[in-house]
Amino acid sequence: MSQTEEKKGIGRRVQAFGSFLSSMIMPNIGAFIAWGFIAAIFIDNGWFPNKDLATLAGPMITYLIPLLIAFSGGRLIYDLRGGIIAATATMGVIVALPDTPMLLGAMIMGPLVGWLMKKTDQLIQPRTPQGFEMLFNNFSAGILGFIMTIAGFKILAPLMKFIMHILSVAVEALVHAHLLPLVSILVEPAKIVFLNNAINHGVFTPLGADQAAKAGQSILYTIESNPGPGLGILLAYMIFGKGTAKATSYGAGIIHFFGGIHEIYFPYVLMRPLLFIAVILGGMTGVATYQATGFGFKSPASPGSFIVYCLNAPRGEFLHMLLGVFLATLVSFVVAALIMKFTKEPKQDLEAATAQMETTKGKKSSVASKLVSSDKNVNTEENASGNVSETSSLDDDPEALLDNYNTEDVDAHNYNNINHVIFACDAGMGSSAMGASMLRNKFKKAGINDITVTNTAINQLPKDAQLVITQKKLTDRAIKQTPNAIHISVDNFLNSPRYEELLNNLKKDDQA
């Protein structure tokens, strides 16, 4: 294997790990927001203080949210059975450290117990006497839950206490030394070229929850989510950009600032690598502003939208929130404008930059791909139904795997029994939701009413999936998750000619 291929393989594995972390947190963001509203509104210094209702905030962050995260992690590994026992075992960590929200502990315990439950069943089920299945299933789960709850209480809890102490001390040291803005030097480039949701939800969300539970709010929720640096880049393109980049920057700015989908500005930075300086300085400015004003959120600002920022702003600190976003935007814009004004035009166009971003992130971006319109054709050979046995031998060659499943030849498949189409993306929320909504509208206009269209994360694709639509860089992972399904790859969730081809095939099968 060449060094380049090895690096790509490592990148895919790290991206998949980051995706797994965010898949535990993102489905539970609604619970975080509900807790944040209760804390912001009903606590003593909230918008409408209520002593009785304020008592909800503590148990929610101490028990409810860690249990939800543990359940999500266990379910990702071993469906409901893994999720239930994972949540059970996590109680050991929670009870051992009742004063610290055990989000990190839940993120460890959930997948671990889910995996152990899976291995336990694989060991016991083939040896279970006929007629004793329910007894063995229930007792094996109960015994594992018992053992892991004790292990969580006695082993993982002390370890988590030590880890949380080290991390808290590190964050506090940065805050007291007024060095927290320096974190942006790592965060801003990392989220553009590699990990996005994993940084916010895998690192800042659990640490921020611990800080918010103790101090009432956390600045950590603002570090990655501030829409200002990205808006500054896009404003610079609106004024000083040329061609396609300038024309598309207006729509991108609206999607980014109000929709909170940050990945849409990543290609604009990659077109001119010097713009990394602009987003870093913009991010540092935002963090420095919030640190100087003592600003923070009570719950995660997800997605990183200005609307979410407005809704999450604590009482009496709305102007502080506006100031942080405005200054981050201003600094990013000024630096980007200077770079664009006094440096040469990039050799790389927007389409190439989008492709580069998707390669480094190990995933395709529908909102970024919306900026360009291109379809790439690859040679295809056989239907997915005949390829399940060959998948394992192609795991290390994503292109061959896609060829083997005819992912870009819509006409190569039989759609007679299809009644469910699933759009799958990394997190299962933003881009796949937009793609599913768009295809539902196309089906409605075409009079196709007997096919359901939904969206999900790749990690949560059901084993009995019939037809899965993914962006090309993610299709190999989707195939490994659901090898029996028909898989279609697109370059752009919102603008692909393959949808019309799919509609034509479905109409033919319906008329046959």
Curated annotation (Swiss-Prot):
Residues 365-376 have a biased composition (Low complexity). PROSITE patterns: PTS_EIIB_TYPE_2 (PS51099), PTS_EIIC_TYPE_2 (PS51104). GO terms for biological process: phosphoenolpyruvate-dependent sugar phosphotransferase system. Disulfide bonds: none annotated. It is found in: Cell membrane. The phosphoenolpyruvate-dependent sugar phosphotransferase system (sugar PTS), a major carbohydrate active transport system, catalyzes the phosphorylation of incoming sugar substrates concomitantly with their translocation across the cell membrane. The enzyme II CmtAB PTS system is involved in D-mannitol transport. Homodimer. This is PTS system mannitol-specific EIICB component. The gene is mtlA.
